[in-house]
């Protein structure tokens, strides 16, 4: 099937120390095709988790941007500066740093959503609200996607 991607959804529970078990199918993608670690950063109401090799592509592209543009500096402060490398413990869990847990309002029930080269980490209730909005806008989303050739 070619290059492996993160696909599907999985619901997990964050433990009291802020550790999150990563689904086996996501771990297998990492172990078989990437370094077995994650770089996690914030994006709006969720967190994004990247294999280090995919994250490196983002950093390389970001280095090409002009340092004087306010939008670039804001991107670097918001997205790049919040990135944390997280390694797995021997039970397949990562420790999400407190400031990132707070940013995404991660308390207990967490949904992981595979989106190809990375996956999103959501508070389950926040995810449910976003999916409802997406369903309400489904026709517009499909028209947009048709315009992209998909």
Curated annotation (Swiss-Prot):
<dbReference type="GO" id="GO:0003700">
    <property type="term" value="F:DNA-binding transcription factor activity"/>
</dbReference>
<dbReference type="InterPro" id="IPR035644">
    <property type="entry name" value="MraZ_C"/>
</dbReference>
<dbReference type="GO" id="GO:2000143">
    <property type="term" value="P:negative regulation of DNA-templated transcription initiation"/>
</dbReference>
<keyword id="KW-0677">Repeat</keyword>
<keyword id="KW-0238">DNA-binding</keyword>
<comment type="similarity">
    <text>Belongs to the MraZ family.</text>
</comment>
<dbReference type="Pfam" id="PF02381">
    <property type="entry name" value="MraZ"/>
</dbReference>
<protein>
    <recommendedName>
        <fullName>Transcriptional regulator MraZ</fullName>
    </recommendedName>
</protein>
<keyword id="KW-0804">Transcription</keyword>
<keyword id="KW-0805">Transcription regulation</keyword>
<dbReference type="InterPro" id="IPR038619">
    <property type="entry name" value="MraZ_sf"/>
</dbReference>
<keyword id="KW-0963">Cytoplasm</keyword>
<feature type="domain" description="SpoVT-AbrB 1">
    <location>
        <begin position="9"/>
        <end position="54"/>
    </location>
</feature>
<dbReference type="GO" id="GO:0005737">
    <property type="term" value="C:cytoplasm"/>
</dbReference>
<dbReference type="InterPro" id="IPR007159">
    <property type="entry name" value="SpoVT-AbrB_dom"/>
</dbReference>
<dbReference type="GO" id="GO:0009295">
    <property type="term" value="C:nucleoid"/>
</dbReference>
<dbReference type="InterPro" id="IPR020603">
    <property type="entry name" value="MraZ_dom"/>
</dbReference>
<feature type="domain" description="SpoVT-AbrB 2">
    <location>
        <begin position="83"/>
        <end position="126"/>
    </location>
</feature>
<comment type="subunit">
    <text>Forms oligomers.</text>
</comment>
<dbReference type="InterPro" id="IPR003444">
    <property type="entry name" value="MraZ"/>
</dbReference>
<dbReference type="GO" id="GO:0000976">
    <property type="term" value="F:transcription cis-regulatory region binding"/>
</dbReference>
<dbReference type="InterPro" id="IPR037914">
    <property type="entry name" value="SpoVT-AbrB_sf"/>
</dbReference>
<dbReference type="InterPro" id="IPR035642">
    <property type="entry name" value="MraZ_N"/>
</dbReference>
């Amino acid at each position: 099937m070619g290059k492996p991607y993160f696909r599907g959804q999985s619901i997990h529970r964050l433990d009291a120390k802020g550790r999150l078990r990563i689904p086996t199918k996501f771990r297998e993608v990492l172990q078989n095709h990437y370094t077995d670690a994650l770089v996690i950063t914030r994006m709006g109401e969720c967190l994004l988790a990247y294999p280090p090799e995919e994250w490196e592509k983002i950093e390389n592209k970001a280095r090409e941007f002009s340092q004087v543009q306010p939008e670039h500096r804001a991107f670097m402060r918001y997205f790049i500066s919040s990135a944390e490398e997280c390694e797995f413990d021997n039970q397949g869990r990562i420790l999400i740093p407190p400031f990132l847990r707070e940013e995404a309002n991660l308390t207990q029930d967490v949904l992981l959503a595979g989106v190809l080269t990375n996956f999103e980490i959501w508070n389950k209730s926040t995810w449910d609200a976003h999916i409802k909005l997406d369903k309400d806008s489904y026709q517009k989303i499909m028209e947009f996607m048709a315009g992209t050739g998909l």
